Amino acid sequence: MAIVTMKQLLEAGVHFGHQTRRWNPKMAPYIFTDRNGIYIIDLQKTVRKIEEAYNFIKQIVAEGQTVLFVGTKKQAQLTVVEEAGRCGMFYVNQRWLGGMLTNFQTIRRRIDRLKELEKMEAEGRFEVLPKKEVAELMHEKQRLEKYLKGIKDMTKLPGALFVIDPRKERIAVAEARKLGIPIVAIVDTNCDPDEIDYIIPGNDDAIRAVRLLTSRMADAVLEGRQGEQLAPEPDQEAVVEAEA
């Protein structure tokens, strides 16, 4: 069975690129035509590229590696939480903090601090502290949680990144490239495909398009796990936060 059909791609608007004045010439091989000043992406090529990306993700997960889902733009935030949660992988859906990959040990220390604050709260230790100090600790906890919740249990670097809009996530892309971590990405007509190992030519702005393509990569993770029942329910708190 096909991973995705042309009909599904069309219905989700995956074929709509950016305005013709906002494009990267390196994306020319993936453009079918232009219509009313908008580039139309060649979905036959998109289907093939989805299959390549799907098989790659399935393979690395089958080998025991993880995938980090990255999408901080508003159109992607909710989908990233839901789909990463569905397949039991890690995610970043708020601002990418510089060094999340290249300075991972420092990031781990911040995660340890978050876990320490969570433990203090759970044990009721906040109740014996002055109100001002509790307010400061809660503010610190909420800030750490906002940015690090999706990678809280990530103990080592991921085997790959799945990125929605590599232009927006250029710092994440640069860090992954520096470390030799393969990148799978939804690449619109204004992006540089040369920076990406497995490109999925497609609309990175429409919520339905982002959801369809991201869900297929989550499916690849689940297939790589061969049905292993490890996927938690989507993080409802993060879902609410993404909707806010």
Curated annotation (Swiss-Prot):
Keyword Protein transport tagged: no
CC per GO annotation: cytosolic small ribosomal subunit
Family matches, as InterPro entries: Ribosomal_uS2 (IPR001865), Ribosomal_uS2_bac/mit/plastid (IPR005706), Ribosomal_uS2_CS (IPR018130), Ribosomal_uS2_flav_dom_sf (IPR023591)
Keywords assigned by UniProt, alphabetized: Ribonucleoprotein, Ribosomal protein
Classification via SUPFAM superfamilies: Ribosomal protein S2
Residues making up the signal peptide according to the UniProt record: none
Recorded coiled-coil stretches: none
A molecular function GO annotation: structural constituent of ribosome
Domain of life: Bacteria
GO biological process terms on file: translation
Keyword Cell cycle: no
Family to which the UniProt record says this protein belongs: Belongs to the universal ribosomal protein uS2 family.
Protein name from the UniProt record: Small ribosomal subunit protein uS2
Taxonomic path: Bacteria, Bacillati, Bacillota, Clostridia, Thermoanaerobacterales
